[in-house]
Amino acid sequence: MSKKIKVGIVGATGYTGVELLRLLAAHPDVEVAAVTSRSEAGTAVADYFPSLRGVYGLAFQTPDEAGLEQCDIVFFATPNGIAMKDAPRLIEQGVRVIDLSADFRIWDIPTWEHWYGMPHAAPGLVSQAVYGLSELNREAVAQARLVANPGCYPTCVSLPLVPLLRQCRLKPGMPLIADCKSGVSGAGRKGNVGSLLCEVGDNFKAYGIAGHRHLPEIRQTIAGLQDGIAEGFVFTPHLAPMIRGMHATVYLHLSDGICPETILRDYYRDSLFVDILPAGSTPETRSVRGANLCRISIQQAAQSDVWVVLSVIDNLVKGAAGQAVQNMNIMFGLKETHGLGAIPLLP
């Protein structure tokens, strides 16, 4: 395209922010015009992120000084509670917004306020937001002014379930269990004891068993596709001793006489970022590292009526920044692969 899309990134000093900068640097149709950070205002992006030396000549600015209203689209890579305060003004000025936080993911306001522990600052805007699971809501994303980018766990769990739920192939009243593992980068860049090398290295643990914020998000997707399933959904996340990557093992009960692998292959036949592996395969997190990919396999457990789904993504790419860029491409009628052609890193 002749005129490049002007992009702004709010909160660009975190892991999703730098991942957006990395991906957009390879995008042929965009110009990153503004990057904001209140704490690092005045600091050159290349000084703060040495990996971007020679790539960007920008410096961080405060949101008030960055001229975000002159952008065509703004990404919010901010903590929960920021976008719902700042996005409405930009949308009123004709700027399209993709929010990578959870501010607009949950449609039911009391549910959101319960899980996120604060009053919602823009409840009237929630109904206008499109949930940006690209492979589920592509047509709605294309028309959206505001996209709520999904969380990493919801992306990894939902992508293998969507084709089966759309055909109502899960057995109602039976448990649906997602056993998930995430790299430490999912906790963000702010320092905390739980993310220290001495805490996570050579260690493995579950967390959020009493309730994780992504639970209502996943249940919302399930409930919107098939009745009688979301109530039996159980989700247990784990922290794995790796920097990036996410693995979901999902146990489910399916209708008799179907071939779920065929259902998944048919649904994702034209999807560029979902790879359905042959039955018996075991996708690895390293097979998607650095790429906007989800690799999935499904097979029946031995001597059981339980089916086992394996799903892997890079939590920072398909689980965050990559899916956000994919949604931007859809919104502006671009090829979905633009900026997202990176091959997974190995080793």
From Swiss-Prot:
<comment type="pathway">
    <text>Amino-acid biosynthesis; L-arginine biosynthesis; N(2)-acetyl-L-ornithine from L-glutamate: step 3/4.</text>
</comment>
<keyword id="KW-0028">Amino-acid biosynthesis</keyword>
<keyword id="KW-0521">NADP</keyword>
<dbReference type="Pfam" id="PF01118">
    <property type="entry name" value="Semialdhyde_dh"/>
</dbReference>
<dbReference type="InterPro" id="IPR050085">
    <property type="entry name" value="NAGSA_dehydrogenase"/>
</dbReference>
<dbReference type="InterPro" id="IPR036291">
    <property type="entry name" value="NAD(P)-bd_dom_sf"/>
</dbReference>
<keyword id="KW-0963">Cytoplasm</keyword>
<keyword id="KW-0055">Arginine biosynthesis</keyword>
<dbReference type="InterPro" id="IPR000534">
    <property type="entry name" value="Semialdehyde_DH_NAD-bd"/>
</dbReference>
<keyword id="KW-0560">Oxidoreductase</keyword>
<protein>
    <recommendedName>
        <fullName>N-acetyl-gamma-glutamyl-phosphate reductase</fullName>
        <ecNumber>1.2.1.38</ecNumber>
    </recommendedName>
</protein>
<dbReference type="GO" id="GO:0003942">
    <property type="term" value="F:N-acetyl-gamma-glutamyl-phosphate reductase activity"/>
</dbReference>
<comment type="similarity">
    <text>Belongs to the NAGSA dehydrogenase family. Type 1 subfamily.</text>
</comment>
<dbReference type="GO" id="GO:0006526">
    <property type="term" value="P:L-arginine biosynthetic process"/>
</dbReference>
<comment type="function">
    <text>Catalyzes the NADPH-dependent reduction of N-acetyl-5-glutamyl phosphate to yield N-acetyl-L-glutamate 5-semialdehyde.</text>
</comment>
<dbReference type="InterPro" id="IPR023013">
    <property type="entry name" value="AGPR_AS"/>
</dbReference>
<dbReference type="GO" id="GO:0051287">
    <property type="term" value="F:NAD binding"/>
</dbReference>
<dbReference type="InterPro" id="IPR000706">
    <property type="entry name" value="AGPR_type-1"/>
</dbReference>
<feature type="active site">
    <location>
        <position position="152"/>
    </location>
</feature>
<dbReference type="GO" id="GO:0070401">
    <property type="term" value="F:NADP+ binding"/>
</dbReference>
<dbReference type="GO" id="GO:0005737">
    <property type="term" value="C:cytoplasm"/>
</dbReference>
<dbReference type="Pfam" id="PF22698">
    <property type="entry name" value="Semialdhyde_dhC_1"/>
</dbReference>
